[in-house]
Amino acid sequence: MAKLNASERLVTHHSLTIDTKFRTKATQEVKAQCICPVPEMYMLAPLIVKQKGLVHSYDSGNIVVTLQDVQLYPLLPDNSPTHIVLLINSVDKNGSTTVVKNINTNERVEIQPKYEQGEGYEVSTYVVISLNGNKRTYDMICTSTPGVSTGRLNSLLDRILSEVEKGNEG
């Protein structure tokens, strides 16, 4: 298990672009003629908030990612929100054994999850997305956390937006 420093976190800056995905085998000519409306992030934000609790698994269920919490920021009633903040928890059921050592006595204690009971090591990632963008592209920052790669984060964001779309068809 990778060590997380309790007093510091690495934060990376990204650009998030919202676009459409074709889920059919349309020709490039047909795809080029599509003018599907793409909602702005400020319109999607309240719908993303409703996805709180969404769970998705990776690596044959060994990694389980949960959208643990979602908040619009700032929280002040007289201000319009400018950002959406996501708390994403990832549980790795294949994490290695953690060893805690007392440097005074040299006593070592091994701590290992009960994998057969669904336990694993949990880490959290924070994602902050601006609600104001340019050409469907929004500033985003996220904490760098072991087990939550940029690819996995993109996959989860796609999943969240897919669930938003499913819940608002029609």
Regions found by a protein language model. Give the residues of each.
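Intrinsically disordered, low-complexity linker/loop segments enriched in Gly/Pro
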Residues: 109-169
